[in-house]
Design a protein with these regions (language model features):
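Catalytic-loop region of hydrolases
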Residues: 1-40
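N-terminal cap/lid subdomain of alpha/beta-hydrolase-fold enzymes
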Residues: 29-87
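Conserved acidic catalytic loop of the alpha/beta-hydrolase fold
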Residues: 101-120
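Alpha/beta-hydrolase-fold enzymes
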Residues: 142-221
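Short beta-strand/loop motif that positions the catalytic acidic residue
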Residues: 257, 263-265
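Conserved alpha/beta-hydrolase "acid-adjacent" motif
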Residues: 270-279
């Protein structure tokens, strides 16, 4: 699928911190119908994800595909690699100062260069959902449907605390990527999920608990496909999520929007808390914003947005009519 990767250059961009970037290169992929022949859906990937959202290696292939909930017979799907994610990037400057709002501005410039004036929907999971909020706050009429999944419009103190610990692990561990991944898996899932799956069973060959073997497996896998610089950079982007960083209010940022907003929460998520989504929905409903909070029921916590594909597909099928 890397063969389908396309490159685009943003000639001039000034970040919120005043950095002037010349010839800033990004990569992206299209899936489904040829651009200009069908409604366009932008899908923003998660922290360790990339633009391969569909197909054999796609991280959402059960949701995005021919005759799937996001039907590639009906839609053009675009996925842009978040700068710094390391996917086919050979010379990315990791010292560049960007926040998630900057990335949103850059993505909007990509859409402009591709001559996509309006999207049918923006969908994003985890940090991709935060990015979806950021794009909607910058350009209120960017899409007919705004669909953040297992995410929020800001990094709350709990998320900041976890990204702070992730950063400490990445700076100080002998196996920074592996150990940070092990820590992350404990808040991407839930106690109930792990207890039900492993039941204190042992890996007799290794002489360790199966839950430990499983965590080691995830650590090894991420080491094979993710760089330390990318992990640090994306972790920093995640903690910067905040559409009100200019000290405005949520309502002020979103109220001009005529888009439908569909927040998809996970009832057991201990990373992006469903209570925060309920509060956001309540606040924006008071302002007559067209908003609905959909809930995935799962024991699996944050990662349910990758696991509970049937529930997510059912929700998307109702939204993307």
């Amino acid at each position: 699928m890397k063969d389908d990767l396309k490159k685009i250059v943003i000639e001039n961009f000034e970040s919120s911190s005043g950095n002037k970037l010349q010839n800033f290169q990004l990569s992206y992929q299209f899936f489904g119908k040829r651009l200009g022949t069908a409604p366009v859906i932008l899908i923003n990937h998660a922290l360790t994800g990339n633009s391969i959202v569909s197909g054999k290696d796609g991280w959402w292939s059960e949701i995005v595909g021919i005759n799937r909930a996001i039907d590639l017979n009906k839609f053009t799907v675009l996925c842009i690699n978040i700068p710094g994610n390391g996917f086919n990037e050979e010379d990315f400057n990791f010292s560049v100062e960007l926040d998630l709002g900057d990335v949103a501005h850059i993505f909007i410039k990509v859409l402009d260069k591709l001559k996509i004036s309006k999207l049918y929907a923006i969908i994003g999971g985890s940090i991709g959902g935060c990015l979806t909020w950021e794009m909607a706050a910058i350009k209120n009429d960017i899409a007919e449907r705004i669909i953040p999944v297992a995410s929020d419009w800001k990094a709350n103190d709990w998320l900041i605390a976890n990204t702070f610990l992730q950063d400490r692990i990445l700076e100080n561990s002998k196996d920074p990527i592996g150990d940070a991944r092990i820590h992350a898996m404990t808040f991407y899932r839930t106690p109930e999920s792990l207890n039900q799956r492993f039941s204190r069973s042992m890996n007799n060959e290794k002489g360790i608990f199966n839950v430990e073997s499983w965590l080691d497996h995830h650590a090894i896998k991420l080491n094979q496909r993710f760089s330390l610089s990318s992990y640090k950079f994306l972790n920093k982007l995640l903690r910067s999520a905040n559409i009100t960083r200019d000290e405005s209010r949520l309502e002020t940022k979103i109220m001009p929007s005529k888009s439908e907003i569909h927040i998809i929460s996970v009832d057991s998520d201990i990373f992006f808390l469903p209570d925060e989504d309920r509060m956001t929905t309540k606040r924006l409903k008071k302002q007559k914003v067209k908003i609905k909070n959909h809930v995935i029921e799962s024991i699996h916590g944050h990662d349910a947005f990758l696991i509970e594909t049937k529930q997510i597909s059912d929700i998307f099928t109702k939204i993307l009519i």
